[in-house]
Amino acid sequence: MAAAEMERTTSFDAAEKLKAADAGGGEVDDELEEGEIVEESNDTASYLGKEITVKHPLEHSWTFWFDSPIAKSRQTAWGSSLRNVYTFSTVEDFWGAYNNIHHPSKLVMGADFHCFKHKIEPKWEDPVCANGGTWKMSFLKGKSDTSWLYTLLAMIGHQFDHGDEICGAVVSVRSKGEKIALWTKNAANETAQVSIGKQWKQFLDHSDSVGFIFHDDAKRLDRSAKNRYTV
């Protein structure tokens, strides 16, 4: 299924018409850093003044996390710079958050922006993530915005056949470009991981090969870790 078609056939059809409806339903960190949240647009502000009488619940609640390069430089332990930004559980609250958060092309260099199932932290040490791994895609600088959005829509819209295997996703902004990683919880389940990788490529109309690395390999071998699965 092409990415555009996938977007039309998910529950986000109606939601896109409501784009920034009611951002008040989630949990927000009130001390945000530069490069993390954008100011409300006039269109968004007009929606926030209206009461949304019907909201469309998602299969799971999700949390946005932000990791800035400034915070990373000050952290005393790996992962301590991660900030819980916003938790949402409905289509409308997702769009309310998404429209007030910098997209990858506007994030500061060295930043990481995560979207994970609520109560799962984007760390190897999290019990749910510990035995998992990641699929990764690379993009030229400033070219990952649409793919990041489609990844979020497919993930929170429960479009993957093995959606229960998915922990979350992260977009990372670096000097050479941007990367999107899809985190899963059971790396040894080859059938599930390969299915997720294939569907992810399909949703994004991504033609290049993508690889899957076990967290255990990444922890032991760092950048020398090899792909266990490729699609």
Curated annotation (Swiss-Prot):
Keywords: Cytoplasm, Disulfide bond, Host-virus interaction, Initiation factor, Nucleus, Plant defense, Protein biosynthesis, RNA-binding, Translation regulation
Matching InterPro entries: TIF_eIF4e-like, TIF_eIF_4E
Description of post-translational modifications: According to the redox status, the Cys-129-Cys-167 disulfide bridge may have a role in regulating protein function by affecting its ability to bind capped mRNA.
Location of this chain's protein in the cell: Nucleus; Cytoplasm
GO molecular function, one term: RNA binding
Region annotation (Disordered) ranges: 1-36
Biased composition (Acidic residues): 27-36
Keyword Magnesium: no
Cysteine pairings via disulfide bonds: 129-167
Result, substituting residue 3 to T: In strain: Russet Burbank-0, alleles 1, 2 and 3
Cellular component annotations (GO), alphabetically ordered: cytoplasm; eukaryotic translation initiation factor 4F complex; nucleus
Pfam family, one: IF4E
Family, per entry: Belongs to the eukaryotic initiation factor 4E family.
Role noted for this protein: Component of the protein complex eIF4F, which is involved in the recognition of the mRNA cap, ATP-dependent unwinding of 5'-terminal secondary structure and recruitment of mRNA to the ribosome. Recognizes and binds the 7-methylguanosine-containing mRNA cap during an early step in the initiation of protein synthesis and facilitates ribosome binding by inducing the unwinding of the mRNAs secondary structures. Key component of recessive resistance to potyviruses.
Subunit annotation: EIF4F is a multi-subunit complex, the composition of which varies with external and internal environmental conditions. It is composed of at least EIF4A, EIF4E and EIF4G. EIF4E is also known to interact with other partners. In higher plants two isoforms of EIF4F have been identified, named isoform EIF4F and isoform EIF(iso)4F. Isoform EIF4F has subunits p220 and p26, whereas isoform EIF(iso)4F has subunits p82 and p28.
UniProt protein name: Eukaryotic translation initiation factor 4E allele A
Origin species: Solanum tuberosum (Potato)
